[in-house]
Amino acid sequence: MRSNVDGYGFERGEDFDYKTYEEFMAKYISILARRASKWEVLVQNKTSIVKSRKVKRFCRKGIPNGHRAMVWMCVSGADEKMKRNPDTYKKLLLSQKDQSLMDTIDLDLHRTFPENIYFSTSDGLRKPLRNVLGAVAHKNHDQGYCQGLNFIVGLLLLLIKDEEKVFWLMDTLINDLLPDYYNPDMKAVKADQELLGEIIRWKDPEVYAHIEKHSVSWCLIGIKWFICLFADVLPVETVYRIWDCLFYEGAKILYRVSAMLVIQNRDKLLACKSFTEITDVFKEIVNNPTIVDCHTFLQKCFNELGSFPIARLKKLQEECRERP
């Protein structure tokens, strides 16, 4: 009998495509088993792991759920931060709160995955969600709270039931991997939307010219992708696969995934004759059945887009950040 709730607690709607999902899982289960056996050999009961070319390759091919927390913590640097600051999270939970900040967070608690059984009631993950969001906002008081963080923390909590680890992963994302993304002016994340446009110009000039011709801004296309790190945008397992790379490599994977979402839909986009038609295609892009097959989708992101030299990306990023 088909379950109307997936393994992460998300209710499946009436339009859920069981056929596509079951076809994908029939293939993916053997891939998961193969990757799990390779990770077992690599990890061998270790409580930490060191970054290396092999670990990077393994992250790109997917981390088993049982190892994700440890690997994400280690390769991102969050584990080292937590060890250096053993009492920080506890102190933040006990400290005096900025009530207006907490009121803003409280508004988002009910909006966070209401279709998930673990977030739909007050005795589920809402309290841990509030705790982590409050601690992150108070530690980074100049940034405060940014809408979208609730979805990232929510997906982390579904996988990692340890609030403190989730807090340090968030702190590492905000301050190290994606610095300035969540500042109130959102200048950095907006600049990276322009960078996405430049990457499309570089990788597929025809699609870039067509989108520019119809005056569709890159910010309109990708702002939620980048702020939410694809949480509440793409299927959950696909998001976790993206995060396997994100915690190792930083923002570069966001550019790859975003570019692939655009370029694999080039024929639909080039057929559009207006601003509205293009934006409608982008609304549908995230529902494309090919994205359910997270393994093939990630392979395409790395194999079909060619290299993304760091020096060129940095130069393009600097140019985008200097724009008014």
Please describe what each predicted stretch is.
Residues K90-V132, V166-I223:
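Alpha-helical cores of eukaryotic small-GTPase signaling modules
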Residues L159-I160, V166, I221-N287:
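Alpha-helical catalytic/interaction cores of small GTPase-regulatory modules
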Residues M1-A137, V153, L157-I160, F308-P324:
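N-terminal transition regions in large eukaryotic proteins
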